[in-house]
Amino acid sequence: MVLDQLRIATRRSKLAMVQTHWVKEQLEKAHPGINISIEAMATQGDKILDVALAKIGDKGLFTKELEAQMLIGRADIAVHSLKDLPTNLPEGLMLGCVTEREDPADALVVNKSLKDKQLHELPPGTILGTSSLRRLAQLRHHYPHLIFKDVRGNLITRLEKLDAGAYDCLILAAAGLTRLGFGDRVHQLIPCEISLHAVGQGALGIECVENKPEVLEIIKSLEHEETSQRCLSERSFLRELEGGCQVPIGVNSQISGQDLILTGMVASLDGKKLIKDSKRGDKSNPELIGKELANELKSQGAMEILQEIFDSVRKD
């Protein structure tokens, strides 16, 4: 069966729309003649802006509404920032494609008062905004003299808050800044020795309905093998730790020849406990590498740290 139309579900945010239109354009180039439509909608994570993400819970926070459209037959695929896509998907859905990754690093963005400072030079009392527990824990570990403040809203809103003086600096995903045309706001890319990035950060994931080979054949034209191998190892690591995108779990992955090297981290919210290790294996079996690394961190006390975090969030 040859498809002549494809329906894409996506979030309404500006970044999501930019990413989805890119996917649409690439698919149209690869499959001339196909009619592709986009249905944009708000997700729970888009609507709740006055509560920290970690307190809401993150299972499908930015994906459930899109997945529902596919499950009832109103959409064929959904385009996600892969870091927002849970590692366990609803029955009947699958991760069909992972696109080539942008730089997955975190980025320091500063207001003009700090334009001559690098991260390690920020003075005591500097107010740093982030909504990510992963970034918070790692930066507290390395820079306990800074003041950390939650920040919500879309990327443009966050930059406006920064420029208005509500924060001295922000930590944001470099890929998101680049995709929205704010690459010039990247003051410094944070080294992975300081802040391991989120699982899947910088890549797009295209989710689709299982048992629809005609859809899978269309979207596989955007698959990037190396990115897919790296992200599958990262997602396996996260899945084995039973974590989500709102817990202090960070990763870094790279491919060297036939080997895939995965580094993973789990940290306490105050940054005082931080466990980090690496695993090397054959890139043809990326999920095994992620699972083995997770088990190694478990043996070093990772689950005890995560349980303390889950208990703390529930109390709040």
UniProtKB/Swiss-Prot annotation:
Subunit field text: Monomer.
Gene expressing this chain: hemC
Pathway(s) per entry: Porphyrin-containing compound metabolism; protoporphyrin-IX biosynthesis; coproporphyrinogen-III from 5-aminolevulinate: step 2/4; Porphyrin-containing compound metabolism; chlorophyll biosynthesis
Listed PANTHER family: PORPHOBILINOGEN DEAMINASE (PTHR11557:SF0)
Miscellaneous information on this protein: The porphobilinogen subunits are added to the dipyrromethane group.
Lineage, broadest ranks: Bacteria, Bacillati, Cyanobacteriota, Cyanophyceae, Synechococcales
GO cellular component: cytoplasm
HAMAP family: Porphobil_deam (MF_00260)
Sequence positions bearing S-(dipyrrolylmethanemethyl)cysteine: C245
Organism of derivation: Prochlorococcus marinus (strain MIT 9211)
GO molecular function annotations of the record: hydroxymethylbilane synthase activity
Function: Tetrapolymerization of the monopyrrole PBG into the hydroxymethylbilane pre-uroporphyrinogen in several discrete steps.
Cofactor comment text: Binds 1 dipyrromethane group covalently.
Designated name of the protein: Porphobilinogen deaminase
